Amino acid sequence: MSPETLRHSQRSAVHRLRLLTVNTHKGFTFFNRRFILPELRDAVRILSTELVFLQEVHGAHQSHALRWKDWPPTPQYEFLADSMWPEFAYGRNAVYPDGDHGNALLSKFPILAFHNHDVAIGDHEMRGLLHAELDVPGERAVHAVCVHLGLQEHHRQKQLRLLCRLLSGLPVDAAVIVAGDFNDWRCKADATLAECGLHEVFTRAHGAPAKSFPARWPLLPLDRVYLRNCSGHEARVLTRRPWSHLSDHAPLAVEVHL
């Protein structure tokens, strides 16, 4: 790297970025009574974070498109990205006759590459790890992994080991952000992921993971933000209106210092 290029990199380097992670419940309220994806998009846009980690987002659903008048003509993740997040990646986890759903990542930074890792254990629950490499200005690579793990503890433990295997293949000095719905109500993930260098933002700041489910009366700590080679600040659980009525999970918002 030439001195001029180095100076340019230092001037334009990004040292902080904001993220949001939310299980969208496929765009419906808790008991599937209303389709509220347009309202969710408005709320997410107001925060204007650099990264958005989405779980349970539809790529397509033919019968819903016929039933709900506000159903978008594009995949849900594209509808949510709109003009705010020019880059997005989608990892299809479940496919059925009417359509599909999975994880998605919205980014204000270029996505250099992405891959969806199938971590389903058996045929009952389709789960995935959506891994993306981001072109964030600075001296280190930034990797993001959007996670949705299974409902059974022994499935989750196997999936956490698969996540650690994925992370072991990344550059040792890369900044790594892992966020999503871990379904880890028994709080077993922290110890497993500490072995591969991750720390959980809310646990480090407050001594315990954030309670995020159900959104209206959060009792269970299902959602997480884990980091490696970077630090989390201003960690918040968004439990007030409108968030408490936009999904069955309360979103988590964090500022990451690279």
Regions found by a protein language model. Give the residues of each.
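Active-site regions of metal-assisted phosphoester/phosphodiester hydrolases
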Residues: M1-L51, D82-S83, E87-L258
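Short loop/turn segments at strand-loop or loop-helix junctions that form parts
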Residues: V22, Q55-H58
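Short, flexible/disordered intra-domain loops and linkers
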Residues: T29-R34, A60-P73
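Short active-site-proximal "capping" loops at secondary-structure junctions
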Residues: V57-Q62, V95-Y96
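Extracytoplasmic small-molecule ligand-binding "clamshell" domains
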Residues: P75-Q76, L80
